[in-house]
UniProtKB/Swiss-Prot annotation:
Biased segments, Low complexity type: 106-132
Superkingdom classification of source: Viruses
Bias kind Pro residues: ranges: 136-145
Quaternary assembly: Forms a complex with the host H3/H4 dimer and histone chaperone ASF1. Also forms a complex with host H2A/H2B dimer. Interacts (via C-terminus) with BGLF2; this interaction is important for infectious virion production.
Coiled-coil residues: none
Biological source species: Epstein-Barr virus (strain B95-8) (HHV-4)
Compartment annotation: Virion tegument; Host nucleus; Host cytoplasm, Host perinuclear region
Residue segments, region Interaction with host histone dimer H3/H4: 63-64
UniProt KW keywords: Chaperone, Host cytoplasm, Host nucleus, Virion, Virion tegument
Region (Disordered): 1-217
Regions of compositional bias (Polar residues) in chain numbering: 32-42, 208-217
GO CC term (a single one): viral tegument
Protein name: Tegument protein BKRF4
């Protein structure tokens, strides 16, 4: 709160100073011209219309920047200033001798750029001292007459014989074929019934528990 009141007090002091400056300016202008009374009344109306409390140093800085937009001195000449002229020292650098030196080169370049149509019409070929005279190109040989019909194609060479790239090893003797007797036929699958029948047919009936009755044991 104290800071706010202090800032308001500073602003009121600035407003009083600005008002006193404006009053002095209006009084001076009234003493110089007769018609200053009307302008003074207009200025007083403008001052009363504007809010004096809103006017600050920032507005004053903006007004100064509008009058002088850049830091350059308006008295000095610039690139865009039409009233600026080069000084005597600048003019002395470029003399008439430079113009005389530039003219013969430009004339030589113009003479070398003469179009070929003008040279043919005049019939004369101006040859500058630094270039050789032009020599005519030799005439082109006549184009060969087109041959009608297809020319026979050369015969094709014989196809190369394909050689096997696989390396053959040493010659092995052929294996002799052994022809022996035919293999025996395997016995038919045995079953307990047939086996028992076979055994019963070939062996005599067992009578008593004797050792000869069990020869397979």
């Amino acid at each position: 709160m104290a800071m706010f009141l202090k800032s308001r007090g500073v602003r009121s002091c600035r407003d009083r100073r600005l008002l006193s400056d404006e009053e002095e300016e209006t009084s001076q202008s009234s003493s110089y011209t007769l018609g200053s009374q009307a302008s003074q009344s207009i200025q007083e109306e403008d001052v009363s219309d504007t809010d004096e409390s809103d006017y600050s140093d920032e507005d004053e800085e903006i007004d100064l920047e509008e009058e002088y937009p850049s830091d350059e001195d308006p008295s000095e000449g610039s690139d865009s200033d039409p009233s600026w002229h080069p000084s005597d020292s600048d003019e002395s650098d470029y003399s008439e001798s430079d113009e005389d030196e530039a003219t013969p080169g430009s004339q030589a370049s113009r003479s070398s750029r003469v179009s070929p149509s003008t040279q043919q019409s005049s019939g004369l070929t101006p040859t500058p001292s630094f270039s050789r005279p032009r020599t005519r190109a030799p005439p082109r040989p006549p184009a060969p007459a087109p041959v009608r019909g297809r020319a026979s194609a050369p015969p094709r060479p014989p196809a190369p014989v394909q050689q096997s790239t696989k390396d053959k090893g040493p010659h092995r003797p052929t294996r002799p074929v052994l022809r022996g007797p035919a293999p025996r036929r395997p016995p038919p699958p045995s079953s307990p019934n047939t086996y028992n029948k076979h055994m019963m047919e070939t062996t005599p009936p067992i009578k008593g528990n004797n050792n000869y009755n069990w020869p397979w044991l």
